[in-house]
A protein has these predicted regions:
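Short, surface-exposed loop or secondary-structure junction motifs
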Residues: 3-199
Length: 199
């Protein structure tokens, strides 16, 4: 670790996008492979090495910058503390108590779709075709093969039907109609307005 200020980053900093990471490379597998001169598709450890060899942009907690990388770290922390795979822990300890039984970490390709998973489309204005994330050189739809979705883990890989997502939100929103799976204090902390920017 080049910058010793990394040791000052807390779980709360990660949750609030206040870690100070210099960039967010998770949607740039091919760039990471080229930059690090890898002979394989980048794995989590490669992303860690890339980010940790740079200085932080700002001291942890002093500013905010959206960070998928921070949420990847949170996924790893959950695995380390629980001793269980991230997806298994979240399904058993969060989603099932909320009444959600059909949410999953998604796949990268159309063929990976779960039975109730939506068909994705590329937004107008985005390049529809990009190089496949694994460096094959094959051009694919951005939403099917453009990114390594399972690698994202807690940083945006979850998929679920609108009904499942509504159940989850209802179980953590602090409203009385549905019993919350977290405490009122946790709801208040989670929803506290803490920044004047965009997140």
């Amino acid at each position: 670790i080049k910058d010793k200020n990394y040791y000052k980053i807390t779980v709360e900093h990660l949750l609030r996008h206040q870690g100070g990471f210099y960039r967010d490379p998770l949607f740039s597998s091919n760039d990471v492979r080229n930059q690090m001169q890898l002979d394989h598709t980048p794995v989590k450890e490669d992303f860690y090495k890339l980010v940790l060899r740079h200085n932080l942009r700002f001291m942890p907690g002093e500013s905010q910058r959206y960070s998928n990388f921070g949420y990847l770290l949170l996924s790893e922390i959950i695995e380390k503390v629980s001793g269980r795979p991230y997806e298994e822990f979240i399904c058993e300890e969060v989603l099932k108590p909320a009444g959600c039984y059909d949410m999953h970490i998604g796949g990268s390709y159309y063929s990976d779709r779960f039975p109730n998973e939506a068909r994705y489309y590329t937004h107008e204005g985005e390049g529809k075709f990009v190089e496949e994330f694994n460096g094959s050189g094959v051009m694919v739809e951005r939403c099917y093969g453009g990114n390594n979705i399972p690698l994202l883990s807690g940083a945006g890989a979850w998929c679920g039907s609108p009904a499942e997502i509504a159940r989850l939100v209802a179980s953590i929103n602090g409203r009385p109609e549905v019993e919350d799976i977290i405490s009122a204090d946790a709801v208040a902390q989670m929803t506290e307005y803490f920044d004047k920017e965009t997140y």
